[in-house]
From Swiss-Prot:
One of its GO terms (molecular function) is methenyltetrahydrofolate cyclohydrolase activity. This is Bifunctional protein FolD. NADP(+) binds at G166, R167, S168, S195, T236. Pathway: One-carbon metabolism; tetrahydrofolate interconversion. InterPro entries: Aminoacid_DH-like_N_sf, NAD(P)-bd_dom_sf, THF_DH/CycHdrlase, THF_DH/CycHdrlase_cat_dom, THF_DH/CycHdrlase_CS, THF_DH/CycHdrlase_NAD-bd_dom. One of its GO terms (biological process) is purine nucleotide biosynthetic process. Catalyzes the oxidation of 5,10-methylenetetrahydrofolate to 5,10-methenyltetrahydrofolate and then the hydrolysis of 5,10-methenyltetrahydrofolate to 10-formyltetrahydrofolate. Transmembrane segments: none annotated. Belongs to the tetrahydrofolate dehydrogenase/cyclohydrolase family. Keywords: Amino-acid biosynthesis, Histidine biosynthesis, Hydrolase, Methionine biosynthesis, Multifunctional enzyme, NADP, One-carbon metabolism, Oxidoreductase, Purine biosynthesis. Gene3D superfamilies: Leucine Dehydrogenase, chain A, domain 1 (3.40.50.10860), NAD(P)-binding Rossmann-like Domain (3.40.50.720).
Amino acid sequence: MSAHIINGTEIAAAIREEIRSEVTALKTKAGIVPGLATVLVGDDPASHSYVDSKIKMCQNLGIYSEHHPLPQNATNEDLLTLIAKLNADPKISGILVQVPLPAQISESLVLNAINPDKDVDGFHPVNVGRMCLGEPCFLPCTPHGVQELLIRSGIKIEGTHVVIVGRSNLVGKPLANILLQKAPGANATVTICHSGTKNLPEITRQADILVAAMGKPKFITADMVREGAVVIDVGTTCIGYTPEGKRILSGDVDFEEVKEKAFAITPVPKGVGPMTIIMLMLNTLTAAKRAVGLIK
């Protein structure tokens, strides 16, 4: 029997309507409009596409947006000056600097310059520390999206063994921290695997919930998955193009093989991807509410 397909597009659409209602209410009752500033350095097509999708989503939800493009040869000082301006701008609730950045730019220097209260990507050390301590913070968008996918799909997380394959600062590490918290929608036993892990299939087969987040197309095969497990595929690698020039994406899981063994599985596309951008919008809304003391 094939697995239940967890449709991230449908779940993200439901959250989108919740956010739209809150944005409208915030405008009507308090005269507050959440605002997101995006910063893009250079002309990378993929980065342009990602930023465009975020701007369109802001427009769709009634969130104010500003886009600040900078040339490929921009300096650290250029970015720091812009970020200081955005930090001080009351119209801007959240700031997103699209990564990766050109080689001459210090990513850590730039991201750490963002006011933690406007760090809607959840990358600032202050927010990372708060996340680890279980304090109110901005959660990184993709890991938070994974958690919401599980919760809204009715999948129990508490008391389960979650195995995460991948230890990146963007997904693996923060997701582990989120899911091990003593909190609703978490409280799992978490194992992180990586390139140095021995006997990887033995460990992945122990997972009640298996998360693949290493960026290796179809790396997770059926023999690595326990019968009845929940499989979340975070991978999105471009493996080619259609004759029309559209990107062909592959996840980290061999979907066709694994879906015959898993209880539930996310596809690529239409799985985790749509959740990432909607969590960014949720963080932007949260930032606007915190800025005026509506929430902590």
